[in-house]
Amino acid sequence: MKNSMYLPFPSKGLYAITPDRLQGDALLAAAESAILGGAAVVQYRPKSGPASDRLSDGIRLQELCRTAGIPLIVNDSPRLAAEIGADGVHLGKNDGSVAAARHVLGDRAIVGISCYDSLERALRAEAEGANYVAFGALFPSATKPCASRARLETLREAGTRLQIPIAAIGGIDTTNAGQVIGAGADLVAAVEAVFGAADVARAARELCSLFHAPRKRRPRCDDA
């Protein structure tokens, strides 16, 4: 089912991404704690398990996020996002186009694009109507140990060229999140730094505390 009441994507904050190992009640409890800690958006990232379980967990997550007033994004699959009634989808390089995702989800759905270390890919995604882009991995990642690395310099340049929100991902925790925020990231995306913590709400709160007042509009290079 298509969601008829999509929530907007946040302009800044913590982007909490659920790990595949959490399912059922454990997934819901951890996600609720992340939201209580201040997460601005949650991404559901199921990579294994029966399709029926992914669907039922996703529906419960969507209900939780909707009650909290924050968007739920589904990783990789516009079809699963539509079945759940999620607010949007996050696409990697092999997951299809912005237009294809909107055909499944509707024109008001959130569509985010992984851009790795490619500013060109990010500019193209923005031109195609993406709601946000993500760069990474900025640091060694336990979730994706073989992921290619992105540079802080790419974040800095993206901050002067893009008007849509920029998320940073990959090995981000409280020791380095300040670097990526300072380099231009509007959101920090985290899996283990949040859901691997003994106190999920506290971990989320500590990451959220690194954000300051909303930024003014970023200048484009052609504004001069």
From Swiss-Prot:
It is an enzyme of class 2 (transferase). It catalyses: 2-[(2R,5Z)-2-carboxy-4-methylthiazol-5(2H)-ylidene]ethyl phosphate + 4-amino-2-methyl-5-(diphosphooxymethyl)pyrimidine + 2 H(+) = thiamine phosphate + CO2 + diphosphate; 2-(2-carboxy-4-methylthiazol-5-yl)ethyl phosphate + 4-amino-2-methyl-5-(diphosphooxymethyl)pyrimidine + 2 H(+) = thiamine phosphate + CO2 + diphosphate; 4-methyl-5-(2-phosphooxyethyl)-thiazole + 4-amino-2-methyl-5-(diphosphooxymethyl)pyrimidine + H(+) = thiamine phosphate + diphosphate. Pathway: Cofactor biosynthesis; thiamine diphosphate biosynthesis; thiamine phosphate from 4-amino-2-methyl-5-diphosphomethylpyrimidine and 4-methyl-5-(2-phosphoethyl)-thiazole: step 1/1. 4-amino-2-methyl-5-(diphosphooxymethyl)pyrimidine binds at residues 43-47, 75, 114, 144. Binds 1 Mg(2+) ion per subunit. Mg(2+) binds at residues 76, 95. One of its GO terms (biological process) is thiamine diphosphate biosynthetic process. Its cofactor is Mg(2+). InterPro entries: Aldolase_TIM, ThiamineP_synth_sf, ThiamineP_synth_TenI, TMP_synthase. Keywords: Magnesium, Metal-binding, Thiamine biosynthesis, Transferase. CDD domains: TMP_TenI. Its EC number is 2.5.1.3. Condenses 4-methyl-5-(beta-hydroxyethyl)thiazole monophosphate (THZ-P) and 2-methyl-4-amino-5-hydroxymethyl pyrimidine pyrophosphate (HMP-PP) to form thiamine monophosphate (TMP). Belongs to the thiamine-phosphate synthase family. HAMAP family: TMP_synthase (MF_00097). This is Thiamine-phosphate synthase. It comes from Methylococcus capsulatus (strain ATCC 33009 / NCIMB 11132 / Bath).
